[in-house]
């Protein structure tokens, strides 16, 4: 889908650092976790952040 904007990456990395236990490799569960952990006003941004987090977990590229 292309390169993610830096604000998506920043939100995703912060969420993974502080709430890692909430996220899994399932996109739908991550959407709910992003909605509960943040106050992102738009569905589009929430879905992009959830997708970024899911991709990081599935590829194993997230490191503490």
From Swiss-Prot:
A Gene Ontology cellular-component term: ribosome
Organism: Methanospirillum hungatei JF-1 (strain ATCC 27890 / DSM 864 / NBRC 100397 / JF-1)
Gene3D superfamilies: Ribosomal protein S17e-like
InterPro entries listed in its UniProt record: Ribosomal_eS17, Ribosomal_eS17_CS, Ribosomal_eS17_sf
Superkingdom, taxonomy of origin: Archaea
Entry's family note: Belongs to the eukaryotic ribosomal protein eS17 family.
PROSITE patterns per the UniProt record, alphabetical: RIBOSOMAL_S17E
Protein keywords: Ribonucleoprotein, Ribosomal protein
Protein name: Small ribosomal subunit protein eS17
Gene Ontology biological-process entries: translation
HAMAP family registered for this protein in UniProt: Ribosomal_eS17 (MF_00511)
Keyword ATP-binding set for record: no
GO molecular function: structural constituent of ribosome
NCBIfam families: PRK01151.1
Keyword flag Ribosomal protein: yes
